[in-house]
């Protein structure tokens, strides 16, 4: 089983890919009239079902429950969120930890830093241009013309070796997915931490979030 987070344009790409490869999936979206439901006539289910293809109306708390109960092969984060960070925020009582991000900034080339603040950093080898649709991630970026000296995954490992770095695996041109097993390992890892950095990256782009656990009374 696979989970697709978001039923928009990129969620539809994920459905097409999974159908072509004969893999089962559940789409999760807050909108029961999302593009994926309309285009693929997905059957709505109040929760995980035995159907090979289904739609569940829900938010990130729903995704977390499905992740923990189904232990999916892959999670396709097609919605505009940092899925690992947001799932941790749902599961644990967290607040941003900007100081950890500020400590990383000097270790990253300015040319790749797209956004930084409030405990979050976004980096890209294509900082100032739009990405090519369904890009194959060649060594020389077709938009910025930057020749990548390493992947963003490797750059993050250098800049923040203590972070939990999730890899966005290339499933098809322009489409990445996280391994369900690695997401679950991350959530188990967070249980042992008072503060931490989590990152998700592919060859070209990446996002980091820093958190600390709120003190309970």
Question: In which residue ranges do the predicted regions lie?
Answer:
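Extended, charged low-complexity segments
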Residues: 182-217
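Phosphate-bearing ligand-interacting subdomains
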Residues: 39-44, 50-112
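Conserved S-adenosyl-L-methionine
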Residues: 20-24
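A conserved mid-domain beta-alpha-beta active-site/ligand-binding segment of alpha/beta enzyme cores
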Residues: 114-188
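Short, charged/polar "capping" segments at the starts of alpha-helices
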Residues: 33-38
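Gly/Ser/Thr-rich loops at beta-strand to alpha-helix junctions
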Residues: 7-12, 78-85, 118-119, 127-131, ...
């Amino acid at each position: 089983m696979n989970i697709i987070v978001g039923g928009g344009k990129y969620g539809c790409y994920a459905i097409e890919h999974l159908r072509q490869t004969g893999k089962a999936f559940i789409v999760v979206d807050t909108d029961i009239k999302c593009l994926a439901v309309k285009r693929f006539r997905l059957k709505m289910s109040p929760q995980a079902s035995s159907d090979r293809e289904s739609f569940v109306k829900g938010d990130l708390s729903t995704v977390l429950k499905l992740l923990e109960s189904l232990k999916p092969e892959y999670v396709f984060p097609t919605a505009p969120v940092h899925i690992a960070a947001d799932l941790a925020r749902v599961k644990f009582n967290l607040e941003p930890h900007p100081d950890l991000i500020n400590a990383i900034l000097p270790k990253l080339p300015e040319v790749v830093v797209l956004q930084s603040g409030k405990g979050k950093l976004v980096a890209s080898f294509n900082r100032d241009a739009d990405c090519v649709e369904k890009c194959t991630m060649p060594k020389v970026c077709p938009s910025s013309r930057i020749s990548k000296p390493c992947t963003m995954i490797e750059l993050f490992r250098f800049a923040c070796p203590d972070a939990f770095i999730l890899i966005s695996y290339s499933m098809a041109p322009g489409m990445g997915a996280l391994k369900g097993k690695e997401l679950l390992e991350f959530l188990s890892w967070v249980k042992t931490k008072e503060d931490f950095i989590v990152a998700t990256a592919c060859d070209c782009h990446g996002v980091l979030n820093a958190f600390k656990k709120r003190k309970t009374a």
